């Protein structure tokens, strides 16, 4: 399900700066303007000399002459093997590297996914059959209904607080929240206690979410950098751009379904020559044989980031050993844990990933197919496989009232939440075999180990005094050694 990062090293710097003393002379003759720039050398007819004649009307001529022999020459064969003409976004990314030098993969992912003008998520609906990929809520209503059951059961385990926030991070098209609100309205006491916050950066996604969730689709109001609306059943929905804008003094259930996989990462590679960790970066590619306009390179030595996270990296010296570290995801995990410690609640993180540190999983998907990461950036989704082990250990490092439990396979979690019972319940009410077969197909895709059942995993962050719902099969981890 993933493709390794293409490793391209060695940068050819063709932008060496050299200057040569240039003098200029100007002369005005008979209403004719002639501007001439020459070198100190007498022979301005050298083969490196260029002339640009531009008519400015009868009797007017602009003459430019300059010697380029002292300037660095751009390779004549550059870009000749490229698969397509360079895009405006690629020019923009190249300009960044020219000014600042190679960028971290963290910065590259941020630009590709959330750049206001070119970002993949910012200007179109990318979910569902008409988009580039399908997420679990789009597969079947059963998924959202099981998450709704988890919300109600966890609220009860918390002691049924009178006020409860449900916060979804990266809510996609709003399908998951729509199914949760539809399926839980039979639990009146729970329903009367809830409000919803959606953490969304994409204007295009926010528009789709409003259409799916609100009673008055175009009547949501903007207040204090937030957008506020109401569902047909009277549930208040607030859109914010980041988690920090969500109130911290109310018990909260946090939902992150395929959210962490889209967060930026840093990639580190051990160099035996340097006997230290280096960082994998993205640079412009101006070589003759490169397929794309960007390429991956390795830093010449430790960077500021490798120094900052060195205590998190393994201490062994296999040359070329590579590690992905999602610092943004770890920071959000700790932020959620601190909120739960302060005000109570729980979090459910669902994503594809491993219960171990990840080496090389960055991937790009366009039109439901994997493509090269550097192929027309901004037109394909970038994602990584989530490192659940590091999330769990990072939360436990806080040593407060919160803890992390899991992960468990998605298929096992959904079965423990009662998906099979719900499948049978709905199946008895369907009036055609086609509808029943469609329902069963969705169920199988969610729980089958060959589909999403095993690759997708679930982890919870919760108060230590709460017995987490859906995690009875979770392993007991010896995390005394919290070294990642």
From Swiss-Prot:
Localization terms from the record: Mitochondrion
Enzyme class: transferase
Disruption phenotype: Cells show pleiotropic defects. Cell size, growth rate, phagocytosis and macropinocytosis are affected. During development, cells show an enhanced tendency to remain at the slug stage, and spore viability are compromised.
Domain of life per record: Eukaryota
GO biological process: ATP metabolic process; culmination involved in sorocarp development; glutamate metabolic process; glycogen metabolic process; methylation; mitochondrial respiratory chain complex I assembly; negative regulation of autophagy; phagocytosis
Reaction equations catalysed: L-arginyl-[protein] + 2 S-adenosyl-L-methionine = N(omega),N(omega)'-dimethyl-L-arginyl-[protein] + 2 S-adenosyl-L-homocysteine + 2 H(+)
Entry's Gene Ontology cellular component terms: mitochondrion
Job of this protein: Involved in the assembly or stability of mitochondrial NADH:ubiquinone oxidoreductase complex (complex I). Acts as an arginine methyltransferase and probably acts by mediating arginine methylation of ndufs2.
Family according to the record: Belongs to the NDUFAF7 family.
Subunit structure: Homodimer. Interacts with ndufs2.
PANTHER family cross-referenced by the UniProt entry: PROTEIN ARGININE METHYLTRANSFERASE NDUFAF7, MITOCHONDRIAL (PTHR12049:SF7)
Name assigned to this protein: Protein arginine methyltransferase NDUFAF7 homolog, mitochondrial
Source organism of this protein record: Dictyostelium discoideum (Social amoeba)
Designated gene of the protein: midA
């Amino acid at each position: 399900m993933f493709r390794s990062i293409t490793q391209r090293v060695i940068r050819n710097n063709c932008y060496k700066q050299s200057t040569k003393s240039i003098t200029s002379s100007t002369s005005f003759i008979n209403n004719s303007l002639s501007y001439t720039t020459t070198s100190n050398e007498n022979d301005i007819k050298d083969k490196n000399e260029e002339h640009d004649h531009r008519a400015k009307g009868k009797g007017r001529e602009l003459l430019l002459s300059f010697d380029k022999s002292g300037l660095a020459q751009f390779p004549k064969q550059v870009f000749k093997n490229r698969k397509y003409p360079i895009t405006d976004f690629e020019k923009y990314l190249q300009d960044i590297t020219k000014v600042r030098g190679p960028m971290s993969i963290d910065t590259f992912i941020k630009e590709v996914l959330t750049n206001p003008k070119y970002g993949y998520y910012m200007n179109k609906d990318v979910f569902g059959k008409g988009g580039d990929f399908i997420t679990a809520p789009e597969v079947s209503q059963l998924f959202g209904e099981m998450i709704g059951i988890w919300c109600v059961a966890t609220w009860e385990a918390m002691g049924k607080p009178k006020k409860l926030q449900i916060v979804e991070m990266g809510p996609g098209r709003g399908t998951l929240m729509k199914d949760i609100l539809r399926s839980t309205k039979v639990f009146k006491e729970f329903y009367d206690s809830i409000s919803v916050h959606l953490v969304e950066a994409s204007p295009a996604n926010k528009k789709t979410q409003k259409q799916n969730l609100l009673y008055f689709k175009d009547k949501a109001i903007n207040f204090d950098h937030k957008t506020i609306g109401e569902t047909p059943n009277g549930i208040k929905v607030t859109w914010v751009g980041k988690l920090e804008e969500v109130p911290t003094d109310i018990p909260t259930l946090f939902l992150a379904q395929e959210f962490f996989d889209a967060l930026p990462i840093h990639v580190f590679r051990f160099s035996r020559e340097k006997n230290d960790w280096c960082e994998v970066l993205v640079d412009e590619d101006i070589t003759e044989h490169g397929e794309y306009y960007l390429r991956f390179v390795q830093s010449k030595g430790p960077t500021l980031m490798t120094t900052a996270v060195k205590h998190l990296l393994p201490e062994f010296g296999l040359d070329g050993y590579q590690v992905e570290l999602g610092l943004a995801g770890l920071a959000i995990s700790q932020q959620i844990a601190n909120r739960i410690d302060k005000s109570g609640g729980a979090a459910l993180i669902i994503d594809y990933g491993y219960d171990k540190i990840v080496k090389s999983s960055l991937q790009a998907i366009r039109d439901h197919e994997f493509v090269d990461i550097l192929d027309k950036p901004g037109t394909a989704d970038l994602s990584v496989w989530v490192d659940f082990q590091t999330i769990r250990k990072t939360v436990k490092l806080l040593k407060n009232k919160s803890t992390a439990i899991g992960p468990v396979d998605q298929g096992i979690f959904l079965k423990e939440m009662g998906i099979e019972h719900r499948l049978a319940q709905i199946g008895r009410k369907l009036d055609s075999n086609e509808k029943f077969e469609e329902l069963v197909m969705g169920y199988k895709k969610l729980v089958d180990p060959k589909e999403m059942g095993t690759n997708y995993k679930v982890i919870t962050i919760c108060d230590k005094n709460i017995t987490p719902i859906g995690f009875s099969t979770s392993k007991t981890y010896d995390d005394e050694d919290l070294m990642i």
